[in-house]
Amino acid sequence: MARGRLYSICVSPERGQIKQEVAEAEVITGFGIQNDGHAGDWGRQVTCLDWESVQRVNREKGLDIGPGQLAENLMIEGIDLSRVAAGDKLKIGTETVLKVTQIGKEDHPSVVTRALGISLLPYEGLFCQVIKGGLIRKGDPVEVLV
């Protein structure tokens, strides 16, 4: 089982906004991250990106993309998320469990592509449902459960 850590947590009150980084967040079973506009009763409650992928894009494109700018909720460090499959689960901290429901999504003009000219969620984003909620904090351990 792959292990890493939670690099960042980001939320926005409404869709279509750049997300803001927070130190901790309450994750609600079957809903998503409290105070995030993408939370709800659907399959894409929480979005995850690989921090190493963001760093690669920064190097290749000469950008300085940081947490929240790609519309992700969670950036994970130390796990190759390209090896995670739909149906796999991510355990964050001591109790929170997310189930990967989708990898990537339709690519459409968004606040991210208009601002940065690039978007990773359509190609590398993990979209998840919350199987078990709890409090998560920046730096928490992350483990892939298959």
What are these regions (language model features)?
Residues M1-V146:
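Metal-cofactor-dependent catalytic cores
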